[in-house]
Amino acid sequence: MDGSSFLDISLDLNTNPFSAKLPKKEVSVLASTHLKRKWLEQDESASELREELNRVNSENKKLTEMLARVCESYNELHNHLEKLQSRQSPEIEQTDIPIKKRKQDPDEFLGFPIGLSSGKTENSSSNEDHHHHHQQHEQKNQLLSCKRPVTDSFNKAKVSTVYVPTETSDTSLTVKDGFQWRKYGQKVTRDNPSPRAYFRCSFAPSCPVKKKVQRSAEDPSLLVATYEGTHNHLGPNASEGDATSQGGSSTVTLDLVNGCHRLALEKNERDNTMQEVLIQQMASSLTKDSKFTAALAAAISGRLMEQSRT
DNA sequence: CGATTTTGACCTGCGC
DNA sequence: GCGCAGGTCAAAATCG
């Protein structure tokens, strides 16, 4: 996927909405000194405003450049990752989306582009090889197996994995993704000392989405969130009904993760997971930058106001 | 007081 | 058939 296809870096941050409306210095004949003073005051504040706007404009430019750089490095990373993947597991390319069954051949699993299943080195000993395979199998099943009687629709439920960097001291096992979740279970699993938390979307039973969150055994600073299924509703911050309706609301909620998540779901399973990992990391680092989020919020609200005017 | 979380019990599928 | 492990349920506890 081309990074720039979902991130329009030509975004007009709209931080200069008044530039076209600045009063031209037409000298009119002012009859009284009172009026003259008033005009001088206005002129002064206008020049102050202009200065401020210039400053904001240059900041805007810097942000745009920053964004372009981020997209560039995203594309580089993505290409690099694809190259690595095609070199390491060419057979993977030919397989379809795996069915969630315990008997699933581990090699067919496509959901772990990074780390989790590659922490142990390959060993030529058949016994250990088997053991290694078994461990991989277990790890993968950990995130995929579903032993409940499943309906057809559930069987087709999309599974995606998201890695979220967190503080190692944070034991809450919460991943902020814009949706509201209700925890319904927690379990300690065999090959990971940290427990796994089970969440259902708060809109359940109408929304079938579930997620599992567990700290990565290999990198405790990472939370591994596994999503099953797709939301059949908007996020809690969105207006009800039509996703495209902006409804003239002046509130802008930055939900980069969610938006990208939805985009990624349109691709196949493997790409989906890869993209989400990268997107998640990008989004989390961007949303941590308060300046960026503020500027983006201003830009979006500016756009909305502009649209509502036209 | 309703919503949410916790946690032990129970269910289910799989391998032996 | 049995044991194991992951997933879910539901009563109790906690929170806002």
UniProtKB/Swiss-Prot annotation:
SMART domains: WRKY (SM00774). Residues 82-145, 230-250 are annotated as: Disordered. Residues 170-236 bind DNA. Keywords: DNA-binding, Nucleus, Transcription, Transcription regulation. GO terms for cellular component: nucleus. Pfam families: WRKY. Coiled coil: none annotated. Disulfide bonds: none annotated. Its main location: nucleus. Gene3D superfamilies: WRKY domain. It is found in: Nucleus. Induction: By salicylic acid and pathogens. GO terms for molecular function: DNA-binding transcription factor activity; identical protein binding; sequence-specific DNA binding. One of its GO terms (biological process) is defense response to bacterium. Transcription factor. Interacts specifically with the W box (5'-(T)TGAC[CT]-3'), a frequently occurring elicitor-responsive cis-acting element. Positively modulates defense-related gene expression and disease resistance. Constitutive expression at high level causes severe abnormality in plant growth. Belongs to the WRKY group II-a family. This is WRKY transcription factor 18. It comes from Arabidopsis thaliana. The lineage of its organism: Eukaryota, Viridiplantae, Streptophyta, Embryophyta, Tracheophyta.
